């Protein structure tokens, strides 16, 4: 009995130990599960955060694309505005060039006049027949010349002065004190304006302005149309010209082929369908009318079959070969008239022929 009691106690102790071990293992497993769940939660959080970042980036990209589209629209508008401004500038330059041409013509005329005046002045200077005109402001012109004698001097001294100082002969050169008139002022101002215009439209200034204008125009052209695009446009124009020439040549060939393919009047033989024996048949044929009988074996249609044998179909060839088939027993019936129609047949190799189609009238 004591032995059994000790054995039962030992079994209980062993069970307690096993239960403690299993509890420890369960705790460890629970801890591992919790740690794994924490890691999974952190991973899920990181994934969600990355998704949010990606969405934000997508939004930023959409906004950037919208801004780029807006910039492109603005650029197109500015491009159209620049094109309009350039057209206006070209019109203004044309007007300015026309005005410059007019001014040049006027300046040339004025130069001719100036050269004439200079030549006249040189001739007058050579002849030495001219009058000196002195301009003085606010000084009245003396009407007469008066000589005042000094009473203090004796008569002998006066005679000596007259001997040593002879009077000046003013017959050749006469002096006039003339006020400047309005016409003279206008002439002076006109000459000054002409001098300014000559300086402004001199060769050096015109060359400089042309160079600057050419530089600006070339810059605007390169901005509007690139040289590569110009080359492409030139090549496309050449291609269009070549295609137009080809079309013109093909049209000429087509006309020539049509004119060569038209048959002559001698190629067809028109006659009555059949000569009736009875007067009744003649009356019926008169009522029915005249037709066209084209015999395949005749010499008139021989050249058509030789030159245009490809243009007929098999059925048409059979129709041309078929003659008037007599019925068994009795008189041969009057054949029905045939309709002759001509159709031009166009081929790819630019050879045209007439298609002869024979249809029996119903």
UniProtKB/Swiss-Prot annotation:
The modification Phosphothreonine is found at residue 334. Expressed at much higher levels in cardiomyocytes than in non-cardiomyocytes. Keywords: Activator, Cell membrane, Coiled coil, Cytoplasm, Developmental protein, Differentiation, Membrane, Myogenesis, Phosphoprotein, Transcription, Transcription regulation. One of its GO terms (cellular component) is cytoplasm. Residues 227-255 have a biased composition (Basic and acidic residues). Residues 1-24, 227-261 are annotated as: Disordered. This is Caveolae-associated protein 4. It comes from Rattus norvegicus (Rat). The lineage of its organism: Eukaryota, Metazoa, Chordata, Craniata, Vertebrata.
